[in-house]
Structures are given as C-alpha cells and as structure tokens.
Swiss-Prot record:
Pathway: Lipid metabolism; fatty acid biosynthesis. It is found in: Cytoplasm. Residues 2-77 form the Carrier domain. It comes from Methylibium petroleiphilum (strain ATCC BAA-1232 / LMG 22953 / PM1). This is Acyl carrier protein. InterPro entries: ACP, ACP-like_sf, PKS_PP-bd, PP-bd_ACP, Ppantetheine_attach_site.
Length: 79
C-alpha cells in the first residue's frame, strides 16, 4: 500500500467514523460506509487539506469510492 493510499484510507476512516479495516478500495462511501451528503463534503475538504489540492465540485461528485479517492489524490497530490 502506498503512502498516499494509507493516508486516504486513514482520512476516510476518521471522517466516516469507521474502522480503518473496513475501508477497502472497492467500498462506496454512501452504500458501503454509511456516509451522507454532509459526510462526503467533509471528506472532500479533508482530502483537500491533507494533500494541498483543490477538488472542484464537479470532480468531487465523481469521487464515490475509496479507490476513486485514492486515484484522485495520487494524480493531483502536491504533498
């Protein structure tokens, strides 16, 4: 697991209040991890802070799974 992947999973676990072991790449935030729309907004903000990136709303709407969050962070991370 890459450093970015581990950091993304840690943020997701913290933001959604689930165990890190439950945060696997194929999990969807809403369907599998119980997130609501506010949770997803807060999750995107946490990812932006952690990786010093800006995620436009139209992109944020597409980040619906753990793997998509990891992929986005890997391709846009500055830190």
């Amino acid at each position: 697991m890459s450093d970015i992947e581990a950091r993304v999973k840690k943020i997701i676990a913290e933001q959604l209040g689930v165990a890190e072991g439950e945060v696997t790449n194929e999990k969807a935030f809403v369907a599998d991890l119980g997130a609501d729309s506010l949770d997803t907004v807060e999750l995107v903000m946490a990812l932006e802070d952690e990786f010093s990136i800006e995620i436009p709303d139209e992109e944020a709407e597409k980040i619906t799974t753990v793997q998509l969050a990891i992929d986005y962070a890997k391709s846009h991370a500055k830190a």
